[in-house]
């Protein structure tokens, strides 16, 4: 009776953040083999052998015989109970998101901090409690997942930093298709502080299997038909918007022929497996890239925080080298009075 009264399973109390969950012994068929141990102890010196019984009796006077009380429970029921508790605790992590309509309306969703019960650690704590018959409350281990983009960062995008547009003919349907595809692939991108934008990474391979079509492209100083013709107009439009917004250009090359849609020094050539247009966000706030294509016009807009808005002009110095037209491209930062306070070299063309 003493054993049964003092070695009985109790409720297992699991605490987390002011919430308490209880697992009762009946829910997991938890019990201890006390009856078997009592029977074993009672019969220890009652074997069929008289001499063995005498030996065991005298051995007990010298050494204590330890009999193990074992726990018995239904592992499947325990797992199901812990899974049920985890579902009441777990919260999926969600990044805050920025939404900007084609007309320029800005909104943002809130971030959600993720929570996930450490099931393995919870089971180990319960196993220890049962084994040691120590039913003090267990503090659950819950892993916290912080969102990469928090609410404050998303809501800091509150104004248009810069925009640039170029025109194109709608007569070549293949070229229009390529423009629309690449503009969409590089649009609605939130670029966090220090993060780099890669045009090629976002569009992926510009192949027919990805929807791109044959259209005129500049290859070795000549216009030829090739898959993806027109995507460079999108990258060039974006390049100019990037310059006006003060972002850091990290990779840009010009075409071998002067482009029809931007002046010399203002284009950005891209090619699969080759030239890429890349830039970084130098600000402490995120920026958001938004491209639109409508009625023969590509517009690239870059949004960010009002404190990062700059008064920038683009300066191009044309020159001739080897009988070919070339140019040096600069951006000029101006103060509120329009005076140039800083000139930054971008690249040669």
Model-derived features: positions:
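Short N-terminal secondary-structure initiator segments
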Residues: 1-3, 35-56, 142-167
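Structured segments of extracytoplasmic/periplasmic soluble domains
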Residues: 2-6, 44, 61, 76, ...
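Charged, low-complexity, helix-prone segments enriched in Lys/Glu/Asp/Gln
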Residues: 3-5, 9, 37-42, 156, ...
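A generic beta-sheet turn/junction motif
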Residues: 7, 16, 293-295
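Signal peptide-directed extracytoplasmic domains
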Residues: 9-75, 79-114
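Well-ordered beta-sheet/strand-loop patches within structured domains
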Residues: 84, 92, 99-101, 113, ...
């Amino acid at each position: 009776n003493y054993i049964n009264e003092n070695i009985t399973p109790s409720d297992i109390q699991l605490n987390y953040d002011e919430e308490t969950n209880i697992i009762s012994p009946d829910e997991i068929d938890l019990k201890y083999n006390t009856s078997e141990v009592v029977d074993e102890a009672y019969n220890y010196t009652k074997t069929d052998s008289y001499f063995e019984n005498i030996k065991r009796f005298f051995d007990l006077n010298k050494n204590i015989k330890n009999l193990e009380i074992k726990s018995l429970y239904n592992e499947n029921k325990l797992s199901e109970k812990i899974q049920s508790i985890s579902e009441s605790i777990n919260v999926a992590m969600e990044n805050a998101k920025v939404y900007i309509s084609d007309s320029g309306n800005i909104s943002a969703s809130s971030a959600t901090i993720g929570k996930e019960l450490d099931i393995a650690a919870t089971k180990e704590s319960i196993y220890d409690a049962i084994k040691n018959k120590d039913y003090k409350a267990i503090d659950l281990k819950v892993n916290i997942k912080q969102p990469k983009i928090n609410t404050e960062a998303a809501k800091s995008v509150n104004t248009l930093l810069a925009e640039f547009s170029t025109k194109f003919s709608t007569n070549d349907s293949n070229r229009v298709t390529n423009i629309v595809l690449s503009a969409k692939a590089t649009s609605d991108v939130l670029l966090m502080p220090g993060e780099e934008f890669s045009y090629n990474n976002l569009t992926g391979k510009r192949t027919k299997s990805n929807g791109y079509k044959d259209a005129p492209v500049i290859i070795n100083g000549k216009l030829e038909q090739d898959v993806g013709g027109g995507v460079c107009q999108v990258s060039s439009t974006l390049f100019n918007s990037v310059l006006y917004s003060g972002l850091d250009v990290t990779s840009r090359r010009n075409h071998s022929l002067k482009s029809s849609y931007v002046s010399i020094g203002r284009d950005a050539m891209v090619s699969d497996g080759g030239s890429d247009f890349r830039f970084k966000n130098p600000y402490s706030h995120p920026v958001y890239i938004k491209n639109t294509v409508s009625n023969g016009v590509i517009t690239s807009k870059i949004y960010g925080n009002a404190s990062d808005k700059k008064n920038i002009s683009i300066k191009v110095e044309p020159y001739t080298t080897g009988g070919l037209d070339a140019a040096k491209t600069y951006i000029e930062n101006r103060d509120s009075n329009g005076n140039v306070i800083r000139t930054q070299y971008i690249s040669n063309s």
